[in-house]
């Protein structure tokens, strides 16, 4: 199994979980690197905070799904084909949760336009 297959879920999960946790606790400052990067969310500081407060839990959940998949790949899955299926399905789930986070953030941030 390739290193990318092993570490992509871990890296994506860690970044998503940390970003989600900081966002929902209102400790993620507006920046150019991390967070939900949508025009409406970035339109003001109030929109940024409201968007991340609303989307943070979903982003955190997606990160936990990806982290669990990464740990599962490292511990339980030496078979390459099974590992690829686990990584793909878990990352699809994590990306869907990130999509819900973006939708929730956009909805919350629109109140500040």
Q: What are the residue ranges of the model-derived segments?
A:
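Juxtamembrane loop-transmembrane helix junctions in multi-pass integral membrane proteins
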Residues: 3, 47-50, 54, 78-85
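C-terminal structural segments of small proteins and small subunits
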Residues: 77-112
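Alpha-helical transmembrane segments of multipass membrane proteins
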Residues: 67-72
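Membrane-water interface of transmembrane alpha-helices
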Residues: 20-35, 104-105
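A broad detector of short, well-ordered amphipathic alpha-helices
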Residues: 18, 49, 53, 100-103, ...
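Select subsegments of transmembrane alpha-helices in polytopic membrane proteins
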Residues: 53-66
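Alpha-helical transmembrane segments
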Residues: 4-19, 87-95
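Cytosolic, membrane-interface loops and tails of multi-pass inner-membrane proteins
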Residues: 29-49
């Amino acid at each position: 199994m390739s290193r990318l297959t092993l570490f992509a879920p871990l890296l994506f999960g860690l970044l998503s979980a940390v970003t989600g946790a900081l966002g929902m606790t209102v400790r993620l400052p507006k920046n150019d690197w991390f967070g939900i990067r949508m025009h409406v969310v970035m339109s003001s500081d109030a929109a940024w905070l409201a968007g991340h407060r609303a989307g943070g839990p979903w982003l955190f959940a997606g990160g936990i799904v990806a982290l669990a998949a990464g740990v599962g790949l490292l511990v339980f899955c030496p078979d390459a084909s099974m590992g690829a299926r686990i990584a793909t399905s878990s990352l699809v789930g994590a990306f869907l949760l990130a999509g819900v986070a973006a939708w929730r953030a956009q909805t919350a941030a629109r109140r500040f336009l």
